[in-house]
């Protein structure tokens, strides 16, 4: 079962410049693990040293924040879309998520 | 503290209808009108703030003609137009997002427009900040913005705050306004604006952009989540701005800032369904709008049930910005552009490495430089010989400092960072080279 993971602009450089990736997964945790095993550079931008999702990165299943669902245990099926939504500062000077 | 107002700027009137109204209304300018309960999709009722109206306030015949396309719509009409005239909106930033915000709010007849910015117009702004003209380059943005607004609608009172917004002045500046529209470009100010709005109970109309992507929402802690409910913390220290990853399509802030102007006007009118509790995502490349649900976080440090942030804090420190710029782990030896030119003139052997991106290399380059984009340095460092003298450069010197640091850790010793990058080269050595 492949779920679509939407990659935001600032992170596309670490995901082969793709705007979305299809991953076989039953939960959000599996999908993100699959994504970061495919694109190793993404890992440190999504997770901290303890392997927890960084607090400036939110993950949504369709339009719901997984923090208010079952977090990484949130089940997904192939019609679902997972979105990674990092905070962006915006404007002229960009403080971006870069290595 | 806000600077003293320039006597050349329009002074704020002492007897604005809004202030008179505020004095008469102990509840303040925002009163909850039970008639304006708006149903948010499956989320129950949201109480819309609405300005109380001053019965003595009227439009002149000129204003009636000017706003006639508003007045003939029942959703605005005379009542709404008078609300707009009484409204006081504070725009944080007179740049990419601040441009459409200020232009459309002024044109729509928002009576008082505060603007906070301390920047000066430069040529790189003109690609998107259409409130400023070519002739304005070198002028303070607020002076330039004020002139444009005055040309569009002389009825608008512009109150400039040519200052760096900080924890000491934010509450004092914000307190006189009904709505704050956040068009800033950095995390410390985002969190400062959010916290000040939560503490004062004011709506924060949020917009943010990155390259081809935008976000917009209305953070109004009385009725829904705040920015910290969405993002409790900013990215950690060490994540510095990089020109390679920056850039923004000129039209994008026009779209996102216009959405902010629209939401601001809806809040003033008390009409429609505001972006409270919703995050709008806009992808310009694929022309897609998406919407995510935002929920109030009961554990939010500023608007939750047990807040730990009860006054403004040091936001530079909170965001790990302070002191970050010049604290590399190892000392990075530097060399000036003039010294590099001298080495070239004296035909001293050295290798010049350019760590910018290929599309930057096409804009301008120093003759003889070898292009190895920063991201490729680890896998291509075998192309360099640690026995050679090496000078590394980028656009401004930030990325090349990282490359030098990395190469030194890998055993390179005869290596220098070109201080100020190609910008310094263009300034001090080759004035015919374009800057970007």
Question: Where are the predicted features?
Answer:
Chain B
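Glycine-rich phosphate-binding loop and adjoining beta1-alpha1-beta2 segment
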Residues: 116-153
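A short, aliphatic-rich alpha-helical micro-motif
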Residues: 84, 173-178, 384-385
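Residue-level detector of alpha-helix initiation sites
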Residues: 96-99, 110, 120-121, 184-188, ...
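Rhodanese-like catalytic fold shared by cysteine-dependent sulfurtransferases
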Residues: 49-51, 147, 284-298, 302-350, ...
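Glycine-rich adenosine-cofactor-binding loop
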Residues: 80-106, 112-117
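E1/E1-like adenylate-forming module used to activate ubiquitin-like modifiers
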Residues: 47-52, 153-259, 269-271, 286-288, ...
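N-terminal charged helix/coil linker that caps or initiates catalytic domains
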Residues: 46-90, 312-314, 318-328
């Amino acid at each position: 079962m492949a779920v679509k993971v939407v990659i935001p602009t600032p992170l596309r450089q670490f995901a082969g410049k793709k705007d979305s990736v299809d991953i076989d997964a039953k939960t959000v945790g599996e999908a993100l693990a699959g994504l970061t095993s495919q694109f190793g550079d993404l890992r440190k931008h999504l997770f901290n040293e303890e392997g927890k999702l960084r607090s400036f990165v939110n993950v949504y299943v369709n339009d719901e924040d997984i923090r208010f669902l079952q977090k990484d245990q949130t089940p997904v099926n192939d019609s679902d879309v997972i979105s990674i939504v990092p905070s962006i500062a915006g404007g002229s000077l960009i403080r971006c998520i870069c290595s | 503290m806000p600077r003293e107002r320039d006597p050349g700027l329009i002074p704020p009137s002492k007897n604005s209808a809004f202030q008179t109204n505020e004095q008469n209304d102990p509840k303040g300018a925002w009163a909850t009108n039970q008639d304006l309960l708006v149903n948010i999709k499956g989320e129950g009722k949201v109480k819309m703030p609405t300005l109380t109206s001053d019965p003595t306030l009227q439009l002149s015949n000129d204003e009636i003609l000017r706003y006639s396309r508003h007045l003939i719509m029942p959703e605005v009409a005379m009542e709404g137009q008078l609300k707009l005239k009484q409204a006081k909106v504070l725009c944080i930033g007179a740049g990419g997002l601040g441009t459409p915000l200020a232009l459309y709010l002024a044109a729509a007849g928002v009576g008082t427009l505060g603007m906070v910015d301390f920047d000066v117009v430069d040529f790189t702004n003109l690609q998107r900040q259409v409130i400023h003209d070519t002739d304005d380059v070198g002028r303070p943005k607020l002076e330039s913005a004020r002139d444009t607004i005055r040309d569009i609608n002389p009825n608008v009172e512009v109150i400039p705050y040519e200052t760096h917004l900080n924890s000491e002045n934010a509450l004092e500046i914000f307190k006189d306004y009904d709505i704050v529209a956040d068009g800033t470009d950095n995390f410390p100010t985002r969190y400062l604006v959010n916290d000040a709005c939560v503490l004062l109970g004011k709506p924060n109309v949020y917009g943010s952009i990155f390259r081809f992507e935008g976000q917009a929402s209305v953070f109004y802690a009385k009725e829904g989540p705040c920015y910290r409910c969405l993002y409790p913390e900013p990215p950690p220290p060490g994540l510095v701005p990089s020109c390679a990853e920056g850039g923004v399509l000129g039209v994008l802030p026009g779209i996102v800032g216009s959405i902010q102007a629209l939401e601001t006007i809806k809040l003033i009118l008390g009409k429609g369904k505001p972006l409270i509790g919703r995050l709008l995502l806009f992808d310009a490349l694929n022309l897609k709008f998406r919407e995510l649900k935002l929920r109030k976080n009961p554990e939010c440090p500023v608007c939750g049930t047990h807040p730990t942030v009860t006054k403004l804090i040091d936001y530079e420190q909170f965001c790990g910005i302070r002191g970050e710029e010049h604290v590399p782990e190892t000392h990075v030896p530097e060399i000036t552009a003039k010294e590099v030119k001298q080495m070239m003139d004296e035909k001293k052997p050295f290798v010049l490495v350019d760590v910018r991106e290929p599309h930057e290399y096409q804009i301008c380059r120093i003759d003889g430089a070898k292009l190895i984009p920063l991201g490729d340095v680890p896998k291509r460092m075998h192309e360099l010989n640690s026995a050679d003298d090496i000078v590394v450069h980028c656009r401004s010197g930030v990325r090349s400092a990282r490359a030098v640091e990395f190469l030194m850790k890998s055993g390179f010793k005869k290596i220098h960072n070109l201080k100020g990058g190609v910008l310094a080269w263009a300034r001090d050595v080759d004035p015919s080279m374009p800057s970007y």
